[in-house]
Structures are given as C-alpha cells and as structure tokens.
C-alpha cells in the first residue's frame, strides 16, 4: 500500500520543524520508519502534479502550516510548487531510514540553518507529535502512555456485534453512511473523465470490460473501485470518504456495495445497511492489522 496520508504526515512534521526553526531551512534531514518510507515514496501529492516525498518535504518547509494538521499543504500554489522544485534541485533534502526502531509510524525531521537547528518527531499517529526541540532546548517531550496494541484492541468489536448493529440500528442513525456512496462514486466518475495514475479503472471500463472481462456487475465493481483509487493515488483534488484513516480502504468498502446494489435494484435501506456492514467489517479487521500495515489494507 502507498498512502497519501503518510506523505502528508511527513509534510506536517517538516512544517512543525520549520516553524520551530523560525527561518527557511537550508538543509532538511528526514528519518522515517520502514513502513512510512515505503508507503509514502510513490504517491501523488495533491495540488502539485508531482509524486514522491521530496516535494512533500519541500512544500512542508516552504508553505506548510502545522495548525492545518493533515491539510498542512492547503495553501499550495503553482508558484510554491516551482519553489519546491528548486529547493529539491539544490539538494537541500536528505531522506533516509531510521534504524533500530520498533514503531511502525515514525517521522523525524531536522531543519537547519547555519546557526540554528530544530527537530520534530511524529510517532504512533499521523498527527501525534512526541518531541519538539530548538537548538538545545526541548519544547515537547511526550512519551506515549498507551501502546499501539492496547489502543487498537480497545473497542472490543466482533463480527456478531458488527452484523447485528448493521441490520438492526435505527435507519436514521446510520443514514450518514450514504455520504460514502456519494463521494466515492463521484471520485470514480471523475476519474473516468481524465487520466489519473495508471488509469486502470478507465482502461477496465473500455475495451477490456466488454471484450475481455465481460460486461457484468463484477467488471463494473472492478472498474469503479479502481478508478476512484487511481484518482486518489495520483493526488487528484477529488474528495473521498476514508475508513480507518485510509482513503483506499474507504473506497474498497464502499464502491463494490454501491455498484452491486444499483445493478440489482436494491432499496435505499438495503444499501445503507450493507454499507454499514461493509465499513464496520473493515474496522473490525483493521483492529488486527494495526494502525500501519506494510501490506495494502484494501
């Protein structure tokens, strides 16, 4: 799995370190856990038309605002992207693996000028700062009091609870789940109109769907789900509804259900309850996978 959220978390950590430095960094050192490094290295960064960690790091330093959290690059402009490209070309960024750590989600950033240094560390959660320092002065040093395993196990879900809730909960209390259908289907339909990522969904919807895979509900499920993921992974400015913090998991939990329901004439209530069952099942499974898996969560 490659994840935009991981790239943006790196940009957030860079922004915090740069803000703490109080000046435009001359050098930026980024140390990442293996999972973050692998997940973030090949995804599109929204609003830039570019792929990879260097542009996320550069923009985090140049225009990032840590107060925006995972919208840290909200103020990105074409001019900022050009400045970021120059920052990269000047070889001011060094990205490497953080050795000898067990934390799957770990981001350490050191920003430097000629006479100042600032460090920020995110660990355990994509917006969880555990350490901030400027020069030799520690500004934040917060060790996690709850292990990842304990935190993930806390809801105590099981499949019977998930199933019973999805089938018996008052309809008006779970109607909000239709927002996942609206947003994620719109993302797929937008992807069909353009060329995003590998354009797998668009390709499946064309000749391959009709002549190779067959024009069936199953091929339609594949094309819609792939198209929405194409747009998201390419960094398109298209909103999707996530599940457990993952856009791809949200798409995968939503679009197969939506396409099947539409093509089989299911009622709105059946769609709502099926979507709720699907999304809660993903959350139940995610408890066992942990916060950040090295494999694709979808």
Where are these regions (language model features)?
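Alpha-helical support elements that line or immediately flank enzyme active sites
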Residues: 7-23, 249-266
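Hydrophobic alpha-helical bundle architecture
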Residues: 17-20, 260-273, 283-298
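Hydrophobic, membrane-inserted alpha-helices
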Residues: 37, 279-283
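Hydrophobic, small-residue-rich transmembrane alpha-helices and their short perimembrane loops
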Residues: 228, 232-250, 284-292
